[in-house]
């Protein structure tokens, strides 16, 4: 390294001397002005003035010579620069593995050939993946046609009509609807009011008709017992209204008629007579209520004078 630096110093000095000599030997320009221009720049045309303003090139050339001398003192840097640029294929970073080193040593033609098989391999891997996916889809969708065939075969064996096949292939949601349809179509009496529905409506009317008859019979029994209790009591006689007297006298003949005529006509006569008696008793009750309501109303706090 030291010898290279020593050689560089005299070369720099010789270069500076040659440059000064060239500047001194420049021919005069046609414009009769001295020009300090390097030797390689000569006047091309006699009319043009190549000279710069002032004599400012002398110190610049001197500075260049000094810089060249200083650069000769750095042997390590100059030695690396003089050797020239090295081939890029030999420079390999340590971070890369042996595979990258081998690729750097190989020529570019082989690298391109290697990259092409890698791209084709990646394309083949993608195509194989797509092929596998297609196989999976086919395997998943394959059982569907046998199911249709198995569903259509029993319909043919059972002798069903072809339009019934969609009902067989339908889902659970459509299997529930025909049940209600069959119930409505096969049993139309459920949608109409039959005899069974009409009977309960007729029964309350008959019960309402029988209830007042029973109430009338009970009233008659009480009215018959009241005069007997009044007659047998110790001087306690209850006043009886006049319309009740003939009713008490008419009861024995009714009983005799029932005993004499045990047929269906006797029951009809008894029911007719009971209805007439009930009407009379209800009329008596109405008269009593009207008599009470017709009485003069008296304030509760005022004394009543007769």
Swiss-Prot record:
Entry-linked Pfam families: DUF4691
Domain of life from the UniProt record: Eukaryota
Chain segments carrying region Disordered: 40-156
Composition skew (Low complexity), residue ranges: 64-73
InterPro entries: DUF4691
Disulfide bonds: none
Bias type Basic residues, positions: 129-139
Full protein name: Uncharacterized protein C16orf86 homolog
Organism: Rattus norvegicus
């Amino acid at each position: 390294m030291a010898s290279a630096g020593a050689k560089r110093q005299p070369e720099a000095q010789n270069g500076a001397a040659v440059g000064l000599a060239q500047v001194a030997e420049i021919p005069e320009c046609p414009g009769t002005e001295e020009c300090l221009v390097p030797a390689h720049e000569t006047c091309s045309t006699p009319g043009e003035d190549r000279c710069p303003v002032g004599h400012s090139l002398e110190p610049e050339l001197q500075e260049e010579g000094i810089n060249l001398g200083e650069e000769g003192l750095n042997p390590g840097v100059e030695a690396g620069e003089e050797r020239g640029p090295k081939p890029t294929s030999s420079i390999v970073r340590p971070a890369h593995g042996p595979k990258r080193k081998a690729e750097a040593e190989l020529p570019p033609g082989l690298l391109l050939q290697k990259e092409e098989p890698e791209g084709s391999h990646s394309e083949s891997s993608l195509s194989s993946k797509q092929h596998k996916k297609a196989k999976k889809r086919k395997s998943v969708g394959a059982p569907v046609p046998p199911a249709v065939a198995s569903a259509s075969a029993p319909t043919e064996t059972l002798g069903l009509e072809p339009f019934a096949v969609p009902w067989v292939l339908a889902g659970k949601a459509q299997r529930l609807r025909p049940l209600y349809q069959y119930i409505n179509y096969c049993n139309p009496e459920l949608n109409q009011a039959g005899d069974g529905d009409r009977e309960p409506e007729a029964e309350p009317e008959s019960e309402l008709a029988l209830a007042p008859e029973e109430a009338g019979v009970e009233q008659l029994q009480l009215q018959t017992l009241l005069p007997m209790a009044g007659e047998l009591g110790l001087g306690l006689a209850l006043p009886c209204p006049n319309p009740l007297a003939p009713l008490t006298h008419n009861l024995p003949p009714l009983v005799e008629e029932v005993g004499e005529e045990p047929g269906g006509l006797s029951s009809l006569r008894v029911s007719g007579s009971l209805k007439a008696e009930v009407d009379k008793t209800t009329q008596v009750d109405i008269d009593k209520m009207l008599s009470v309501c017709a009485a003069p109303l008296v304030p509760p706090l005022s004394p009543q004078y007769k």
